[in-house]
Amino acid sequence: MKAKGLVSSTAVFPVYLGLEAEEEEEYKSYREVLRETALKVAKNFGVRISGDDASQFAASVPTWPPFSDTPGSLKELGRRGYKRVILSNVDKDILKQTIYQSGLIVDGYITAEDVGSYKPSEGHWKKFFAEYSVSKENTFHVAQSIKHDIIPSSRLRIENAWINRYSESMPTGVDPSYVFRDLKGLLTILS
């Protein structure tokens, strides 16, 4: 999509997120969500891309690097005895490939494909509690997405931390347990 003039920018990303949310209303594979979203973003900006271009964009997801603090922070959390389970809105094969290529160390994951829905629906959390036999009181949810993670985990009364990497304003009515700029901040409160 870069070749077509669409790159991650302050103008494109908010449009992408809004259109992606529309595509996630009804469950379909995340690859299809990405493909359809890419086509809509391009159209929104008056750029023509082919179905193949949109499919290539969707296929590129596993190559996207994690935030630089993520691998080390996950490793440190494991060293401290915390179980690290990813709740993700992507397809299982995409997440497996991302974990492998990024060298992430996790104890498990639950994907939209596993539950047949996308966060902020509660399917990920229901499966998490059933599969890992853990109570809400012993769960700490860490995420960057207010809409997909912080609001629903707060609604479920799960302690959480918003990783506010882009210094966004706190939306009205949202009250995360903690706010940090990155995962290193999180490590300061978890012993």
Which residues make up each language-model segment?
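N-terminal helical cap/lid subdomain that shapes the substrate entry/recognition surface
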Residues: 1-71, 79, 93
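Asp-based, Mg2+/Mn2+-dependent phosphohydrolase catalytic module
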Residues: 39, 48-49, 58, 71, ...
